[in-house]
């Protein structure tokens, strides 16, 4: 008799957010990101914009302007990383406070 392998349930890659929306769709994820942490997409857009302006300056042969925009890119990228790290810490703190509210009797 042949052995049959056990049926393994599928892995769910995303969970519904606190508002109940499923974040599997790209538009849902973007809306969630813009609503919860708006500085991250703004920083990403600033980074890309600075890089595009630097590229345009290089094509025109304006190396001083290109260097200035590359510096702006580094600043925008650093601000974005700080926003990500700050968002992680804030979210962790909010989860801890929520957990403490559930544990602490009123």
UniProtKB/Swiss-Prot annotation:
Oligomer and partners: Associates with the respiratory chain complex III/complex IV supercomplex.
Lineage of producing organism: Eukaryota, Fungi, Dikarya, Ascomycota, Taphrinomycotina
Regions crossing the membrane: 39-58, 73-90
Ranges of residues in domain HIG1: 9-102
Cellular compartments annotated: Mitochondrion membrane
Record PROSITE patterns: HIG1 (PS51503)
Name the record gives this protein: Respiratory supercomplex factor 1, mitochondrial
Family: Belongs to the RCF1 family.
């Amino acid at each position: 008799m042949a052995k049959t392998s056990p049926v393994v349930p599928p892995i769910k890659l995303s969970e519904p957010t606190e508002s109940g929306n499923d974040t599997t769709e790209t538009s849902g994820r973007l809306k969630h990101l813009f609503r919860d942490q708006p500085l991250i997409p703004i920083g990403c857009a600033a980074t890309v914009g600075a890089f595009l302006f630097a590229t345009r300056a290089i094509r025109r042969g304006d190396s001083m302007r290109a260097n200035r925009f590359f510096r702006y890119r580094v600043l925008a990228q650093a601000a974005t990383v700080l926003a990500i790290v700050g968002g992680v810490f804030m979210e962790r703190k909010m989860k801890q406070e929520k957990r403490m509210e559930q544990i602490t009797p009123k």
